[in-house]
């Protein structure tokens, strides 16, 4: 199938999908606060009940709900939940009432039926917890960022090599976004030719009053490029077809929050990938209150034969539903609305990878490289405000 045939066939498939029962749309997901964003999709189990038991621990960030949504829709069974805060545990049980409450992390790790542990601890604690989990013979699924220091990354690499376990990362801005997964397929098919440049714009809503204290402590959250920048570096590696990249420029600043001096509310970086592709990312905490979603995330992919623009969470002033894909090539222009029509295959692939020791969902090298680039960019960043 040539490039044009692929695009036409894809458009026809998406159009036909409009006649099928839809998954929960972006409008049906709570989207105004990024920290509460937990996408839901169509159940697509790859295992039966009780065949792949997991635990959810350290519920410091509400991304744990998106992580568990994806895993349970793929067939995983949440056997345990553990956190030192009983209020967090009670809230989790409202969403996942079948989980049992563990008295400690040790109780979770002692259960031979638990195959994977999902964790959304304070950013700076995720890496060390992962090593403990892997040493206990479990695979580990961390919220992003998985690390806040290079030492943590190196420790995790050593633990993976020693134990043979997985340390996967919830890079949700691609893995849990249908437009981004659709673009992944377009790029990998060769539909836009060789990728020259990737640009990701990722504004987020700060919601300062509802954030925990650790969110504003530099040593605990890691810096803006380490944190929400990690999503963008992962997307560049994927869309750019890169296994490595060089950070040529990075900057961070605090432009609007003098009462939180350790917060970085703006960051940007430029990278050059080993495939020849170039990258620019911008991240910030300045989503205006008038936007009904947590951020107007955009991705622009320039290929030698076509361009792609993703309007991930909203089409501003036009549609509040997200997952818009705009494609332009030599033959014309297309706008595809893919919400509810692509799904979130990463989670099922991750479960099968854990069972079979494969790497279809994501390679370990890729997961770690995205974090490594974010740490390098953070360390190199010039403070501009």
At which residue positions do the language-model features occur?
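NAD(P)-dependent dehydrogenases' Rossmann-like dinucleotide-binding region
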Residues: 170-175, 189-210, 224, 228-232, ...
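C-terminal helix-rich "cap/oligomerization" subdomain common to oxidoreductases
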Residues: 8-20, 24-48, 116-118, 274, ...
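N-terminal Rossmann-like dinucleotide-binding module
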Residues: 26-96
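Active-site loop of classical SDR/Rossmann-like NAD(P)-dependent oxidoreductases
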Residues: 62, 337-348
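A contiguous active-site-proximal alpha/beta segment in oxidoreductase catalytic domains
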Residues: 124, 147-209
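Contiguous beta-strand/loop segments that form the cofactor/metal-binding neighborhood of enzyme cores
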Residues: 34-45, 50, 234-316, 346-360, ...
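Short polybasic amphipathic segments
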Residues: 299, 316-330
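Beta-loop-alpha module in the N-terminal Rossmann-like domain of NAD(P)-dependent dehydrogenases
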Residues: 60, 96-159
């Amino acid at each position: 199938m040539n490039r044009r045939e692929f695009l036409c066939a894809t458009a026809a498939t998406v159009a036909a999908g409009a006649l099928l029962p839809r998954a929960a749309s972006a409008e049906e997901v709570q989207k105004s606060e990024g920290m509460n964003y937990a996408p839901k999709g169509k159940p697509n189990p790859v295992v039966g009940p009780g065949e792949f038991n997991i635990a959810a621990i350290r519920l410091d960030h509400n991304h744990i709900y998106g992580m568990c949504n994806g895993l349970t829709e793929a067939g995983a069974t949440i056997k345990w939940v553990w956190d030192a805060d009983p209020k967090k545990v009670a809230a989790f049980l409202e969403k996942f009432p079948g989980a049992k409450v563990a008295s400690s992390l040790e109780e979770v790790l002692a259960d031979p039926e638990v195959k994977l542990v999902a964790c959304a601890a304070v950013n700076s604690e995720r890496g060390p917890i992962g090593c403990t989990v892997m040493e206990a013979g479990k695979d580990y699924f961390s919220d992003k960022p998985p690390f806040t220091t290079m030492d943590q990354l190196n420790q995790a690499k050593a633990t993976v090599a020693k134990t043979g376990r997985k340390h996967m990362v919830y890079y949700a801005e691609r893995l849990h976004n249908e437009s981004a997964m659709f673009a992944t397929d377009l790029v990998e098919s060769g539909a836009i030719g060789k990728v020259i440049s990737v640009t990701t714009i990722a504004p987020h809503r700060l919601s300062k009053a509802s954030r925990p204290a650790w969110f504003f402590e530099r040593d605990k959250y890691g810096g803006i490029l380490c944190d929400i920048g990690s999503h963008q570096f992962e997307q560049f590696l994927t869309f750019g077809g890169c296994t490595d990249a060089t950070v040529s420029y990075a900057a961070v600043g605090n432009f609007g929050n003098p009462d939180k001096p350790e917060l970085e509310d703006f960051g940007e970086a430029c990278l050059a990938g080993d495939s020849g592709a170039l990258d620019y990312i911008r991240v910030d905490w300045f989503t205006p209150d008038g936007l009904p979603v947590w951020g107007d995330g955009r991705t622009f992919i320039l290929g030698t034969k076509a361009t792609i623009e993703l309007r991930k969470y909203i089409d501003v002033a036009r549609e509040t539903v997200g997952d818009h894909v705009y494609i332009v090539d030599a033959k014309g222009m297309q706008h595809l609305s893919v919400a509810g029509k692509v799904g979130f295959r990463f989670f099922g692939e991750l479960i099968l990878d854990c069972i079979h020791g494969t790497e279809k969902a994501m390679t370990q090298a890729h997961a770690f490289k995205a974090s490594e680039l974010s740490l390098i960019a953070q360390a190199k960043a010039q403070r501009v405000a």
